[in-house]
Swiss-Prot record:
The active site is at 12 (proton acceptor), 197 (proton donor). The gene is mtnN. One of its GO terms (molecular function) is adenosylhomocysteine nucleosidase activity. Pfam families: PNP_UDP_1. This is 5'-methylthioadenosine/S-adenosylhomocysteine nucleosidase. Substrate binds at residues 78, 152, 173-174. Gene3D superfamilies: Nucleoside phosphorylase domain. GO terms for biological process: L-methionine salvage from methylthioadenosine; L-methionine salvage from S-adenosylmethionine; purine deoxyribonucleoside catabolic process. The lineage of its organism: Bacteria, Pseudomonadati, Pseudomonadota, Gammaproteobacteria, Enterobacterales. It comes from the Bacteria. It catalyses: S-adenosyl-L-homocysteine + H2O = S-(5-deoxy-D-ribos-5-yl)-L-homocysteine + adenine; S-methyl-5'-thioadenosine + H2O = 5-(methylsulfanyl)-D-ribose + adenine; 5'-deoxyadenosine + H2O = 5-deoxy-D-ribose + adenine. The keyword Cell membrane does not apply. Pathway: Amino-acid biosynthesis; L-methionine biosynthesis via salvage pathway; S-methyl-5-thio-alpha-D-ribose 1-phosphate from S-methyl-5'-thioadenosine (hydrolase route): step 1/2.
Amino acid sequence: MKIGIIGAMEQEVALLRDRIDHSTLCQQAGCEIYMGQLHGVEVALVKSGIGKVSAALGTTLLLDHFKPELVINTGSAGGLAPSLKVGDIVVSHEVRYHDVDVTAFGYEPGQMAQCPASFNAAPSLVALAEESVDRLGMHAVRGLVVSGDAFINDADGLAHIRQTFPQAIAVEMEATAIAHVCHQFAVPFVVVRAISDVADQASHLSFDEFLTVAAQSSSRLVEEMVQALAGQR
């Protein structure tokens, strides 16, 4: 089995990178790909950089060169569901863009032309994530994660997302681009992110303070999922 793992920022991948055995580094187009073994499973861990373009590029390199059987997107997110606190987990059952608008041509809000309205995570990976959450005693919410090239910390941006995607549980900047590329390659994916902030006018302050907490939670969950896939759980 080969597993692809992708995160945007140094803090989001550092803990997992340090756990990879026999690691080798490939650097291409601004992305870092660490290949090796995690709990005896072949993995490739990508640090893509921030935003949709960087995420799509990193995912394409991952899928084209490493050819994993599945992709896990890890990292942090801004919480929208009222029950979420810093360090809690969101598990995607679907992802959508919040900053795409071609509704003039009959598409749904967030739907890119000639693409699905949403990208659905593999049910087996969603179940795996939720089972891993339960074993770790974490709190998680499953649902819609929305992505866009904006850090949401203003009232207007938040109101737009809540009005357009009232069912959204979290917002971040890469997941839908990753899912979009996985869809193009027909590779199953799931997004498991930890909450670093609630998407409000103080979110930039809490993000800086709690990114490490979120990274610890999401990395711990990814490790648990890998161990389960390796038959160690």
